[in-house]
Amino acid sequence: MLNRIQTLMKTANNYETIEVLRNYLRLYIILARNEEGHGILIYDDNIDSIMSMMNITRLEVIGLTTHCTKLRSSPPIPMSRLFMDEIDHESYYSPKTSDYPLIDIIRKRSHEQGDIALALERYGIENTDSISEINEWLSSKGLACYRFVKFNDYRKQMYRKFPRCTIVDSMIIGHIGHHYIWIKNLETYTRPEIDVLPFDIKYISRDELWARISSSLDQTHIKTIAVSVYGAITDNGPMPYMISTYPGNTFVNFNSVKNLILNFLDWIKDIMTSTRTIILVGYMSNLFDIPLLTVYWPNNCGWKIYNNTLISSDGARVIWMDAYKFSCGLSLQDYCYHWGSKPESRPFDLIKKSDAKRNSKSLVKESMASLKSLYEAFETQSGASEVLMSPCRTFSFSRTEDTFSTSVINRVFENTGTGTYHPINDIPSLFIESSICLDHIIVNNQESNKYRIKSVLDIISSKQYPARRPNYVKNGTKGKLYIALCKVTVPTNDHIPVVYHDDDNTTTFITVLTSVDIETAIRVGYSIVELGALQWDNNIPELKNGLLDSIKMIYDLNAVTTNNLLEQLIENINFNNSSIISLFYTFAISYCRAFIYSIMETIDPVYISQFSYKELYVSSSYKDINESMSQMVKL
């Protein structure tokens, strides 16, 4: 089995091989090392992320295990309550999602019946979901003629003597609960099909759910510590045996992982006497250090670990940053070299426990030298970033791309006197992130050549982006930027599926799309019905000048330490769907996707095998490389 997976990893550069590898990852976790000896845990949920960061064919497969788990996720974002919008039809009235739909109905009826309106104004009514309680209130106010009657009871001829009664159709809707529809016209009424939506767009547009980006960047911290966790191979899978810190202590324990972790946590608690938050800086820590500790994390130790955050029972927080995400793909030694510190080799992970125990003194010494180099490099990079990317501080972000892009946007806003806002609540954040599609859309599995946009920044820097707060609109306005909840119907003819959906058998579905993606989809032949949108009436001017200013400042700082990093950033910027500027990313990704589709329009669809927002896979047999393809680079 191990030999089979080692062979697959060495040839994992095509779709078919990667899919076979995924099948094994449903059963096993792969233990691998990079060329510098850093351990990497590969499982089914993180293989795509790893492939986006490095060439996995160059990894050394050490073993397989079922004794290691993936990252422990943060407590999930509460699911947005499913939403039904108000429908006011000549035959019926269906209130929007509410805890008290009967109250909404009586208030709606008061618009037509002045005596109900007068009673509501004079006496008010308590919230209730009980028909009998509402009828009791109506009777006490001399309004029994408007009593509420269930549709089924009315059809049984029980209430014909109340011609002015309020007839309601009652139902229970999954994930929402009891719902009622006021039937205005019995002769024409049929129970409607009501769209149950994942978001209430009008709620999401509320001002208090949005904050200006610049006000969210003013953060400070007290202490930064470099850290590395080292793991050895045992019969029960990998186990951590050493945790090194700089400046700080090194903890070694071959007999009890629990005591190793507890000693480390006690030390952390001791150094947090003057601050509530510290920053731990690792390298590729999200791929090995953190998931390995998560497996062995002791219960009732006073700390919880969620992804890259440690939270104590008294509210103290430790943020574990991965400096690799700020390196633009450099190895640890290259990263240290580029930021002016002396590159030092680190101890190899996933060695035999007996070897680690025998060489523990030299491993501790080697680890401390490597961590000192990492610490100095990160401090230098952070200092440079604070100057070049003000007011953005490295520790406030998870990746260089986020820091750089936020700095550019903020600089443009400062120069124009405008500002942009980001969601500060889980629900609008989830709505924005739902519009970001990073997936590869598979058309077919033919052997293909891979092309990538030469410069994503060139494409996105000349486009428009939202400024100020959004407004709610039922349907977006052509020519303005908006993000809409959409009911999408796929074309009946053969087409390239430009709108991603995870169920190929569904022809109609609800999803979140930007105005840019909507325009692209309509060109392909999709039918789009907008069910509510966030619309921005103001745009920021193009980013090109601000971008060029930022690039020039970085180049002018120090050609030795920054140019190579910047060139990699410009050539291969990556977006994600979780950032303070996710609103910017969602439109940037849409612009790139529109560009990719404009190229696909010039190619016979039979030659297209798959694509993403910045990559295109074209059949190896395709020879007609046209002018538009000159803006792509073959990988």
Swiss-Prot record:
GO terms for biological process: microtubule-dependent intracellular transport of viral material towards cell periphery. One of its GO terms (cellular component) is host cell. Belongs to the orthopoxvirus OPG056 family. SUPFAM superfamilies: Ribonuclease H-like. It comes from the Viruses. The keyword Membrane applies. Interacts with protein OPG164. Interacts with protein OPG064. It is found in: Virion membrane; Host endosome. Plays a role in intracellular enveloped virus (IEV) transport to the cell surface through microtubule transport. Together with protein OPG064, forms a complex that interacts with host KLC2 (kinesin light chain isoform 2) to engage the kinesin-1 complex and thereby promote IEV trafficking. This is Protein OPG056. Keywords: Early protein, Host endosome, Host-virus interaction, Late protein, Membrane, Microtubular outwards viral transport, Viral release from host cell, Virion, Virulence. The keyword Nucleotidyltransferase does not apply. Induction: Expressed in the early phase of the viral replicative cycle.
